[in-house]
């Protein structure tokens, strides 16, 4: 978030999910707006924990948050529901990733896990791919995990957001991330 939030609210330490939930209950929080996505998927899941104590949460339950947390899960979901997506293979090792790339550039490499927005690399050449593969498999920059080697697609990338309550949904405005 923005530093300006300090003028509106007091930052609290959120060391772990149980501590955060206890704080929300003791301070009679009546709505939780999930920001940091890792809280949605680790442990019980923020939205799940909020539901357990009766606090509405603007954010997906742990099971649905896997769409953001796991590139492999998201890819399987897209394929299962016939949503157009690039072809991809999942590599568990550096050697396997190099084999799947097969000298074809550009290629897209995606770490299968949360990586604070840094887990995707569009590689135009072997040197760029090798550098990212080193970060993933040798340096373990993002922790343990697998990697998607994905077909490079051209055109604008658009994110579609929606809100779901029970069996009702609302599609929000599309958004683009200009990185």
Regions found by a protein language model. Name each.
Residues 91, 120-125, 162-165, 172-173:
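Short beta-strand-to-turn element immediately C-terminal to the catalytic PLP-Schiff-base lysine
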Residues 84-86, 107-108, 123-159:
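Conserved ATP-binding module of the ATP-grasp superfamily
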Residues 136, 154-179:
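Phosphate-binding core of ATP-grasp and ATP-grasp-like enzymes
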Residues 25-29, 103-104, 143:
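Glycine-rich phosphate-binding loop signature in dinucleotide/nucleotide-binding domains
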Residues 1-60:
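ATP-binding N-terminal substructure of ATP-dependent carboxylate-amine bond-forming enzymes
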Residues 55-119:
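A conserved helix-loop-beta module that forms one wall/lid of the active-site cleft
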Residues 10-16, 88-93, 123:
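Short acidic-hydrophobic, aromatic-tinged amphipathic segments that line or gate anion-handling sites
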């Amino acid at each position: 978030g923005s530093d300006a939030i300090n003028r509106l609210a007091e930052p609290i330490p959120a060391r772990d999910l149980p501590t955060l939930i206890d704080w929300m209950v003791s301070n009679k929080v009546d709505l939780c707006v999930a920001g940091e996505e890792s809280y949605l998927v680790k442990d019980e899941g923020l939205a799940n924990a909020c539901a357990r104590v009766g606090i509405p949460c603007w954010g997906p339950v742990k099971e649905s948050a896997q769409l953001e947390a796991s590139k492999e899960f998201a890819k399987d979901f897209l394929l299962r529901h016939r949503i157009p997506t690039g072809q991809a293979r999942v590599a568990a090792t550096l050697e396997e990733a190099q084999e799947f790339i097969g000298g074809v550039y550009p290629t897209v490499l995606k770490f299968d896990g949360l990586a604070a927005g840094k887990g995707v690399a569009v590689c135009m050449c072997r040197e760029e791919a090798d550098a990212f593969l080193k970060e993933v498999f040798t340096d373990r920059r993002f922790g343990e995990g697998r990697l998607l080697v994905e077909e490079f697609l051209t055109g604008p990338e658009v994110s579609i957001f929606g809100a779901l309550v029970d069996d009702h949904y609302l599609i929000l405005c599309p958004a683009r991330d200009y990185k």
